[in-house]
Amino acid sequence: LCGLEKLRLGETGRSKLLANLMFGAYNRKFPDARTPNDWICSDPEVVAKYTADPLCGQDATIGLTREMLRGIRMIQRPANLQRMDKALPVFFIAGRSDPVGNMGRGVEKAAAAFRAAGMQDVACKLYDGRHEILNEKDRQLVYDDVLAFYERHLD
C-alpha cells in the first residue's frame, strides 16, 4: 500500500489513508476521548498543548511510513535478533494504556522475543499512562528508572 501511495503522492507526500490505517484506531480505546490525540497522554493539559501545537500531529511522509514499517519487520525477524550482541543491556519501557504497544502486551512480547533470542540483560517495565510516558504526570518515576538502569550498566 505504501508503494501505491508513493506512486500517487511521491516519497514526501502525506497520505490520509496510511495515517488513518496506522493511527486511526488508537483513540477508540478511550471512549471518553475529547480530541483525536487523547491516545497520546492521559493528562488533558498535555493533550491540549499537543493538539494546539502546529508542529505536532502531522501525518508522516510516505517515505517515513515505509521505512518505519520496514524497520519493524526487520527487528521482528528471529535471524536479526540472533545477530544482536547478547550482552547488550535493553530496557523496554511503555505505558500500560498505550494502544501503540497493544496496552503493554506488545512491549512484553518484544522483551520476551529478545530473551528468547539469548539476550542476557533484558528489562521491561510498564507504567501507568499512554503513549508518551515521559509526558505523564508520574514522568519523574520513568526518568528515575531509566537513569537507574543506565547507571547499573556504566563501567
How should each PLM-predicted stretch be described?
Residues 1-55:
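Alpha/beta-hydrolase-fold enzymes
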Residues 60-82:
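Active-site nucleophile elbow and catalytic-triad environment of alpha/beta-hydrolase enzymes
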Residues 67-70, 109, 141, 145:
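Alpha-helical elements of Rossmann-like donor-binding domains used by nucleotide-donor carbohydrate transfer enzymes
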Residues 81-86, 117-119:
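Short, conserved loop/helix-junction motifs that constitute active-site signature segments
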Residues 92-94:
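Short beta-strand/loop motif that positions the catalytic acidic residue
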Residues 96-99, 129-130:
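Acidic beta-to-alpha connecting loop that harbors the catalytic carboxylate
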Residues 99-109:
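Conserved alpha/beta-hydrolase "acid-adjacent" motif
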Residues 115-155:
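Catalytic active-site module of serine/aspartate enzymes centered on a nucleophile-bearing elbow/loop
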